[in-house]
């Protein structure tokens, strides 16, 4: 008898898993991830929340476009907002794919919003 493959996670279950990962983070990563989630969803509502390597991520058509890495989980001095190769951020032959995050001010939020909108286009 053939083994059944596990069912693919639904968009709803992936969204719940992403929210659970954020809720389980210690501060200040939780506050930053919560704010980033709201910012990403406002800037690119077509992206779907999910997890990727155990961290919150945002996908277009099932492919991760951007993701958050907790400073505490990775034992770094800053959190990271990263973009995958599916992000539409290409600028010539060289462009950044990750950004260090120590604090989210209005200026950073505006820059992140513009980057996410472009990445998801």
Identify the residue ranges that each predicted region occupies.
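Charge-dense, helix-prone N-terminal extensions
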Residues: 1-121
């Amino acid at each position: 008898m053939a083994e059944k493959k596990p069912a693919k996670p639904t968009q709803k279950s992936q969204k719940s898993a992403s929210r659970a990962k954020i809720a389980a983070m210690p501060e200040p990563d939780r506050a930053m991830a919560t704010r980033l989630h709201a910012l990403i969803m406002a800037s690119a509502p077509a992206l779907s929340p999910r997890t990727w390597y155990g961290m919150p991520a945002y996908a277009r058509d099932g492919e991760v476009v951007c993701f958050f890495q907790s400073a505490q989980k990775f034992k770094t001095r800053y959190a990271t907002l990263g973009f995958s190769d599916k992000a539409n951020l290409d600028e010539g032959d060289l462009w950044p794919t990750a950004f260090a995050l120590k604090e989210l001010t209005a200026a950073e939020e505006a820059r992140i919003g513009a980057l996410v909108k472009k990445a998801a286009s």
